[in-house]
Regions:
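Receiver (REC) domain active-site loop signature in two-component systems and cognate sites
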Residues: 55
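Active-site beta3 strand of CheY-like receiver
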Residues: 44-50
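Acidic catalytic/metal-coordinating carboxylates
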Residues: 32-36, 59-62, 86
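Short hydrophobic/Thr-rich beta-strand motif most characteristic of the beta2 strand and flanking loop
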Residues: 25-32, 40
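Short, Lys/Arg-enriched segments at the junction into DNA-binding effector domains
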Residues: 3, 114-182, 186
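Positively charged, aromatic-enriched patches within helix-turn-helix-type DNA-binding elements
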Residues: 154-231
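Basic, amphipathic DNA-recognition helix from helix-turn-helix-like DNA-binding domains
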Residues: 64-65, 69, 74-142
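Charged docking surfaces used in two-component/phosphorelay signaling
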Residues: 12-23
């Protein structure tokens, strides 16, 4: 049973959402401001955080920033404002996904399950004959000094922890497993975020940008992956 921390100041909303998600099999804990959420994370482990953007005491964006300073667990942001700036800022700070209120209950549950799947298992890959990576029986994946451990969801570059979020880990893993192949934004959105790509949806682009910032320069001077305008990533 996945443990979910819901951080939202709307008491009536949290009661309804807790009832819904409990029926879906999630174990829920609710707090009503960002500071309470940070304190809860200090003392207990959770599989996913649902974080409201507009809150008193400490806003959702500021709470997310402090979460990312210490934790890599997935965060799904909720907001009554479908504001593109809020969405981009949240993704830049490391949110795994963003759902505007009011939302379709089934869509929210699907997004949550997609996040949890990608933080506990490897994404699907396509077959290719010549592989320039090594994957051994301990489920580690190696390429150009980067080593990924699927079971532990940990990534290293030359032995140093890369401190990736669950979404960044899954994205890097899929790119490494399909090195040399063009992966479209549509495919990455579906496989990594669990949703179809919509017009003006830049979630994948923001996750790629965050991943690039965390990866050091390769010793051979080559880019980790290339952006192919209108086609995807290579």
């Amino acid at each position: 049973m996945s443990k979910i921390l819901l951080i939202d100041d709307d008491i009536e909303f949290t009661e309804l959402l807790t009832e819904l998600l409990s029926l879906e099999g999630f174990k829920m804990k609710v707090v009503h401001n960002g500071l309470e959420g940070l304190n809860e994370l200090e003392s207990n482990q959770y599989d996913l955080v649902l974080l409201d953007v507009m809150m008193p005491v400490l806003s959702g964006v500021k709470t997310l920033k402090r979460i990312r300073q210490k934790y890599s667990l997935p965060v799904l942001m909720l907001s009554a404002r479908d504001d593109q700036i809020d969405r981009i800022l949240g993704l830049e700070l490391g949110a795994d996904d963003y759902v505007p209120k009011p939302f379709n209950n089934r869509e929210l549950v699907a997004r949550m399950k997609a996040i949890l799947r990608r933080t506990t298992s490897r994404p699907a890959s396509t077959d290719h004959s010549e592989q320039n990576y090594t994957e051994n029986i301990s489920k580690s994946l190696q390429f150009a000094g980067v080593e990924l451990h699927s079971g532990r969801q940990q990534a290293y570059y030359q032995g140093c922890d890369l401190d990736l979020t669950g979404t960044e880990f899954a994205l890097l893993q899929m790119l490494m497993r399909n090195s040399g192949e063009i992966l479209s934004r549509e495919l990455l959105s579906l496989k990594i975020l669990g949703k179809n790509l919509t017009p003006y949806d830049r979630a994948i682009d923001m996750h790629i940008s965050n991943l690039r910032k965390k990866l050091p320069e390769r010793e051979d001077g080559l880019p980790w992956f290339k952006t192919l305008r209108g086609r995807g990533y290579l």
